[in-house]
Each structure stands twice: as structure tokens, then as C-alpha cells.
Amino acid sequence: MDIEDIDVFIGIDVGKSEHWATALSRDGRKVFDKALPNDEDRLREVYQRLQAKGQVLVVVDQPATIGALAVAVAQDMGIT
């Protein structure tokens, strides 16, 4: 995958009970910017909504610890 293939970039700052997620479109518009519970169903809902805008890239600041669920859900949904 090349960076040119990405339509939506999601950055997730993870926390124990909830995360903060900000998503930008390719042209830099903010398309999501709010708290995101550390909950599989809610993560899937947000990821699906953003996938409707195109190819998604998820970046998590702590992927091996409390951010593992956000990464696992993204991978399960075919998100890079």
C-alpha cells in the first residue's frame, strides 16, 4: 500500500477507559474528532463509518498495550 492509496487517516491517543480519535481526509479536513470508548462494537462502528469515505489508515500511540483492541479490530476489518 502506498500513502497515495489512503483516503482517511485516523490517529488514536489511547487511554484506559476511552481513547481520543481524530481522523483527517486526504485534503486535511477533520472528519472525526472525539472521545472513543475502548469498546469493540463502538470501534467497529466508527471504523465502518470512516471506511465509507475510502481506504483507511489507523495509527495508535500505544499499539501493544491498552491500544491493542483498537489495532486488533482494525486488522480484523482489513484496515491497515
Language-model segments: what does each one mean?
Residues 1-80:
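Phosphate- and other anionic-substrate recognition elements at nucleic-acid/protein interfaces
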